Amino acid sequence: MAKLYFNYSTMNAGKSTVLLQASHNYRERGMQTYLMTAAIDGRAGTGRIASRIGIGAEADIFTPRDDVFAMIRDRLGAGPVACVFVDEAQFLSPEQVWQLARVVDDLDVPVLAYGLRVDFQGKLFPGSATLLALADEMREVRTICKCGRKATMVIRQDASGRAITEGAQVQIGGNETYVSLCRKHWREATGDPGAKGH
């Protein structure tokens, strides 16, 4: 029985590396996979999933307007797919997450989604919130803070390395823009949002 999986973490934990390795494992055994990634994230080039350690693969892109169920159903028309992999899943709309659930439930194809859990303000992305609600299984891909603790948060920083606490939820960037931290160091860097107004 197929399942919807959500593999989540903060920035620079190796989500894309894990996705690419899992897809490779299927393909090595003669099974086809279908890779998708968000059109908004062009850091590796449009329609490409790449990891910081240098591996990559071509992928179909989705925009917020796309019907991902239809995209996957159409791909299945070209031949069997053992598993669907979705990178940058935080950029899925809630409706698209429901469409992925339909792929699992109606087409009996496993879907493994990989994405960020929270943004730089500590808020859930809408796609991630819906994945947390609907996924059959969730797995945390771990990375570490500068202090050695598990990093669960991310800060956005300016060119001088100062934390930015306001702005649009989505701003594409890499190591120069975002830093993964434990909650304690995130609170210190952002001015402890929980203490505001007290």
UniProtKB/Swiss-Prot annotation:
User: Its domain of life?
Assistant: Bacteria
Listed GO biological process terms = DNA biosynthetic process; thymidine metabolic process
Question: What catalytic activity does the UniProt entry give for this protein?
Answer: thymidine + ATP = dTMP + ADP + H(+)
Q: Which GO terms describe its cellular component?
A: cytosol
Where along this sequence does the record place binding of ATP? Answer: S9, T10, M11, N12, A13, G14, K15, S16, D87, E88, A89, Q90
Query: What are the subcellular locations of this protein?
Result: Cytoplasm
Q: Which residues form the active site?
A: E88 (proton acceptor)
Return any one Pfam family short name. TK
Q: Where does Zn(2+) bind?
A: C145, C147, C182, H185
Query: Does this entry carry the keyword Acyltransferase?
Result: no
Assembly and interaction partners:
Homotetramer.
Q: Which family does it belong to?
A: Belongs to the thymidine kinase family.
Q: What is this protein called?
A: Thymidine kinase
Which gene codes for it? tdk
